[in-house]
């Protein structure tokens, strides 16, 4: 069996429940068979214009049930971010497995021109990834590493 067939077999075993809150809502779709993220579409009654350096909360018209042990991560779509300057305001949105409300995308306009978003536009992508929730253990000391407390470029500039 080739890699694509193996991947499809694994994916086909996992299901994520999606509920339309609006009959016009479009279910998330994968652009290709090997896409990691599913495109999220906005569900709007009328176009929304996002002014420069402003944020708009855009509904998808969907609620999802992320499987237990996983999280939904909402990322920018590269084309929308690079070509139009539109990306999630919080950089990465997190959808917890116990959240059942409408999925919304807080879209920020990083550019100098107003941008209009219309019903059915793909505005973000959803990745479903394993999520660990370890118990926090307070300690007096942490083990030493070669890196130590170096951060923010401490491992090199390139």
Question: Which stretches of residues belong to each language-model region?
Answer:
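DUTPase catalytic domain/fold
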Residues: 1-158
């Amino acid at each position: 069996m080739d890699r694509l067939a193996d991947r499809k077999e694994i994916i086909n075993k996992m299901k994520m429940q999606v509920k339309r809150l609006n009959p016009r809502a479009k279910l998330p779709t994968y652009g290709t068979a090997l896409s990691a993220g599913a495109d999220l579409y906005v569900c709007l009654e009328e176009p929304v214009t996002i002014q420069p350096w402003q944020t708009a909360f855009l509904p998808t018209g969907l609620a999802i049930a992320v499987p237990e042990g996983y999280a939904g991560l909402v990322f920018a779509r590269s084309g929308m971010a690079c070509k139009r300057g539109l990306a999630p305001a919080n950089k990465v949105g997190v959808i917890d497995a116990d959240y059942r409300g409408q999925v919304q995308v807080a879209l920020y306009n990083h550019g100098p021109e107003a941008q209009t978003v219309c019903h059915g536009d793909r505005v973000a992508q959803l990745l479903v990834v394993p999520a660990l929730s370890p118990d926090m253990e307070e300690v007096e000391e942490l083990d030493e590493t070669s890196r130590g407390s170096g951060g923010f470029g401490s491992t090199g500039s390139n």
